[in-house]
């Protein structure tokens, strides 16, 4: 019997954004991302490459206002797609963690796909904006993602000076933590409750 593909397509349209995401968890890291926010595209491309996820993402947002709605809504839709692609989560490892360096920067991420939304985020950035992405939105991105992923995320920049390096290390740590958490390691739902 063939395994069912772990994939999802999610569309969300509001007065602020129009977003379509197609995600495959068991991919090869290819992506086509156009969020309208250049640095967010770069981070999501890195995330997919290192997690091994395939992602097509299109967002048409009210960037004439600022990047808030686009960044937040991209995270909400991506989190929903991850949740849908995971199905009942049978056989997944559930937990993942990684510590990733990028030059002088060092970031840590731990993930629990256990069905409870929570985000602990510890990082400070010197630059307020990088290529259209307000750095204050990095935390908001991960908080919004945790909400619709129904996951607990702990993210922390442990060292570093360069804002680009610190944010990229966070996204790559998240990628490797997610790669582990979604990996199939058994047949059962990884919880004594019998569901997550």
Swiss-Prot record:
Key word Amino-acid biosynthesis present: yes
Entry keyword annotation includes Endoplasmic reticulum: no
Parts forming coiled coils: none
Keywords: Amino-acid biosynthesis, Cytoplasm, Histidine biosynthesis, Lyase
GO biological process, one term: L-histidine biosynthetic process
GO molecular function: imidazoleglycerol-phosphate dehydratase activity
GO cellular component, one term: cytoplasm
Record-listed E.C. numbers: 4.2.1.19
Record field: catalytic activity: D-erythro-1-(imidazol-4-yl)glycerol 3-phosphate = 3-(imidazol-4-yl)-2-oxopropyl phosphate + H2O
Cell location: Cytoplasm
Root EC class: lyase
Pathway: Amino-acid biosynthesis; L-histidine biosynthesis; L-histidine from 5-phospho-alpha-D-ribose 1-diphosphate: step 6/9
Family: Belongs to the imidazoleglycerol-phosphate dehydratase family.
Record protein name field: Imidazoleglycerol-phosphate dehydratase
UniProt source species: Chlorobium chlorochromatii (strain CaD3)
């Amino acid at each position: 019997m063939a395994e069912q593909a772990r994939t999802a397509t999610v569309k969300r349209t509001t007065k602020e954004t129009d977003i379509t995401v197609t995600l495959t968890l068991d991919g090869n890291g290819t992506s086509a991302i156009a969020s309208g926010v250049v640095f967010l595209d770069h981070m999501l491309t890195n995330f997919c490459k290192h997690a091994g996820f395939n992602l097509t993402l299109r967002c048409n947002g009210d960037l004439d206002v600022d990047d808030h709605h686009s960044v937040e809504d991209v995270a909400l839709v991506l989190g929903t797609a991850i949740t849908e692609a995971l199905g009942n989560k049978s056989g997944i490892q559930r937990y993942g963690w990684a510590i990733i360096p990028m030059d002088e920067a060092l970031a840590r991420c731990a993930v629990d796909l256990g069905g409870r939304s929570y985000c602990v985020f510890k990082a400070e950035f010197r630059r307020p904006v990088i290529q259209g992405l307000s750095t204050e939105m990095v935390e908001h991105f991960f908080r919004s993602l945790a909400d619709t992923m129904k996951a607990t995320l702990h993210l922390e920049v442990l060292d570093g000076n360069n804002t680009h390096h610190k944010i990229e290390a966070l996204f790559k740590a998240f990628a490797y933590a997610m790669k582990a958490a979604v990996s199939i390691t058994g047949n059962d739902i990884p919880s004594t409750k019998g569901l997550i």
